[in-house]
Amino acid sequence: QALNCYEDLADEINIIGQKFPEEFKWDYFGKIFQDAFNSSKGDWVFRMDVDYFFHEKDIPKIRRILNKYSTSPAIAFPQYQIFTPDRYQLKTKICLALNKKEFPEIKLNGGGDLVLPTLNGKLIEVSDVPNVKIPIYQYDSTFRTKEIIAKDRARFARAWERQFGNFGNRGGGTPELA
């Protein structure tokens, strides 16, 4: 479903992570996002998870925004996390549109989770780039059972622990703790 929403906007879609390992270290996310960025041929690269969606009606606005801010290294979008059809939250603002044409040296290795864009070793801050009012919708929890969510959260907690030596705010390495 998510891939379909990108087709009207994108010249190409690079799909990564099909052979995602069951157990991994947290920095794996940034490495595969970077591989996709590096292999992309377009002027702009959207760093999108498979559960991120644009609404079709927003695609013409997104195209105009990309043209308007063609000298910016990134564009930040508000991200809405959808839990159920009637329950959601504004999760964050995130730099998802990355200007590869003007800034091919962007890396996806920043922030606390090591996947946010950096330029010359410095995090591209949401406050330093254009912020648009076109939301990205994250439907992660909507399409999965509680059991699958718990299993995935435990797997991600173990990856975090391998990277940083603790579980942080992720609970623990079992579905019951995560």
Give short role names for the model-derived ranges.
Residues 27-34, 55-178:
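Catalytic-site signature of metal-activated, phosphate-bearing donor transferases
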Residues 49-53:
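The conserved acidic donor/metal-binding loop of glycosyltransferases
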Residues 22, 54-55:
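Alpha-helix N-cap/loop-to-helix initiation residues
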Residues 1-47:
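Active-site-proximal specificity loops/subdomain of glycosyltransferases
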